[in-house]
């Protein structure tokens, strides 16, 4: 990476953080409003005895809630990551990092600290790293292992963000040979691989390919939350790149709604994280009833993180209380039981799923 590329990468990270904090980057239409869990008027449970803990890739988590990959790669993100990591450690949930490409390719101690601070703040938490699928084609296994070692990661997320790349003036739009790269790394890496989208969802067909490639988990990151094409549209406007702005705006609402993507992915893989517009513990409960193992949130943790770890801990506590309430009124004493709860599918999500199923 050249010095110019290095500066560009770091500046892009800072741009993204500022835009997410200051601009309208939310979409709608996760599909969770179309999912109705069947109420149990006689749950025969002690609320205080409800156990929301899970085993995830051999690690015990206190609740099926993930702090999704967001930040890293700019010194402005260090304190945010410190707060998120401390909260993950205190509450016993999982946390993902943003792309570690900058940490691998830039010779900058402040950039590196934006990543390493996470393990320093959370020595025992489940922390997973992050690289792009496009980078896997370029890196040998030793380079990928460096990303793992950088934060003593328990797993590595491989993100798929080709729509975002297509809307960036400097984007990498060569999508070839990524499945082979993912399979190569899945076979050789020392930790499990989680493949995640970045706001546009994973289809059943793609989930099937990834399952065959040997990945350990899928994170659907569907439509309905933060829109990265929308974020890039703001960047393009500031960079006087009207065509990229137009494309980013046009595809702002593009993707598979999170609920539908979850349904498709759980039919192909037995370890699925539902993210993308997840905002409450009830959303997490619905995702689990659809078959997900856990639910993930990113942007809802960003503002609390700027206020410090206690604010993040409070937000996690709210989510767990909402989840436990949903478990109580569905008669679910455990997450395994919540996965078996009956639900009714309505509206556009039902239409989407029925049409997709009938076309197979």
From Swiss-Prot:
Record keywords: Cytoplasm, Flavoprotein, FMN, Isomerase, Isoprene biosynthesis, Magnesium, Metal-binding, NADP, Plasmid
EC annotation from Swiss-Prot or TrEMBL: 5.3.3.2
Cellular compartments per GO CC: cytoplasm
Gene Ontology annotations of biological process type: isoprenoid biosynthetic process
Chain residues that bind substrate: 12-13, 99-101, 164
Residue numbers binding FMN: 69-71, 99, 130, 196, 226, 277-279, 298-299
A Pfam family reported for this protein in Swiss-Prot or TrEMBL: FMN_dh
Keyword Ion transport applies: no
Cofactor dependency: FMN; NADPH; Mg(2+)
MF (Gene Ontology): FMN binding; isopentenyl-diphosphate delta-isomerase activity; magnesium ion binding; NADPH binding; oxidoreductase activity
Location relative to the cell: Cytoplasm
Record's catalysed reaction(s): isopentenyl diphosphate = dimethylallyl diphosphate
Coiled-coil features, chain-numbered ranges: none
Keyword Metal-binding set for record: yes
Residues holding Mg(2+): 165
CDD domains: IDI-2_FMN
Assembly notes: Homooctamer. Dimer of tetramers.
Family membership: Belongs to the IPP isomerase type 2 family.
PANTHER family assigned to the protein according to its UniProt record, in alphabetical order: ISOPENTENYL-DIPHOSPHATE DELTA-ISOMERASE
Described purpose of this protein according to its UniProt entry: Involved in the biosynthesis of isoprenoids. Catalyzes the 1,3-allylic rearrangement of the homoallylic substrate isopentenyl (IPP) to its allylic isomer, dimethylallyl diphosphate (DMAPP).
Protein name: Isopentenyl-diphosphate delta-isomerase
Taxonomic source organism: Halobacterium salinarum (strain ATCC 700922 / JCM 11081 / NRC-1) (Halobacterium halobium)
């Amino acid at each position: 990476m050249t010095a110019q590329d290095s500066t560009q990468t770091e500046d892009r990270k800072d741009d993204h953080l500022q835009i997410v904090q200051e601009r309208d980057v939310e979409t709608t239409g996760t599909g969770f409003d179309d999912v109705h869990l069947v109420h149990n008027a006689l749950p025969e449970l002690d609320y205080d005895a409800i156990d929301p803990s899970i085993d995830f890739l051999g690690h015990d988590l206190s609740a099926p809630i993930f702090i999704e990959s967001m930040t890293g790669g700019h010194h402005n993100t260090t304190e945010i990551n410190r707060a998120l990591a401390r909260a993950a450690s205190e509450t016993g949930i999982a946390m993902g990092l943003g792309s570690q490409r900058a940490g691998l390719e830039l010779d900058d101690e402040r950039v590196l600290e934006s990543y390493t601070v996470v393990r320093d703040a959370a020595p025992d938490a489940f922390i997973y790293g992050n690289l792009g699928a496009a980078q896997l084609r370029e890196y040998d296994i030793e380079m990928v292992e460096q990303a793992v070692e950088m934060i003593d990661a328990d797993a590595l997320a491989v993100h798929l963000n080709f729509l975002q790349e297509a809307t960036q003036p400097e984007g990498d739009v060569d999508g070839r040979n990524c499945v082979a790269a993912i399979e190569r790394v899945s076979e050789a890496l020392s930790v499990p691989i989680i493949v995640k989208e970045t706001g546009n969802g994973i289809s059943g067909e793609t989930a099937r390919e990834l399952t065959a490639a040997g990945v350990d988990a899928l994170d659907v990151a569907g439509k309905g939350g933060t829109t990265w094409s929308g974020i890039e549209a703001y960047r393009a406007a500031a960079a006087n790149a009207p065509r990229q702005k137009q494309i980013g705006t046009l595809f702002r609402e593009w993707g598979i709604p999170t609920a539908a993507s979850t349904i498709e992915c759980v039919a192909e893989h037995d370890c699925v994280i539902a993210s993308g517009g997840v905002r409450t513990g009830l959303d997490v409960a619905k995702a689990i009833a659809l078959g997900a193992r856990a639910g993930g949130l990113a942007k809802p943790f960003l503002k609390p993180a700027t206020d410090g770890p206690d604010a993040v801990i409070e937000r996690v506590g709210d989510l767990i209380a909402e989840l436990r309430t949903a478990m109580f009124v569905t008669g679910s004493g455990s997450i395994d039981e919540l996965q078996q709860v009956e639900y009714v599918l309505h509206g556009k999500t039902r239409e989407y799923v029925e049409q997709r199923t009938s076309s197979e």
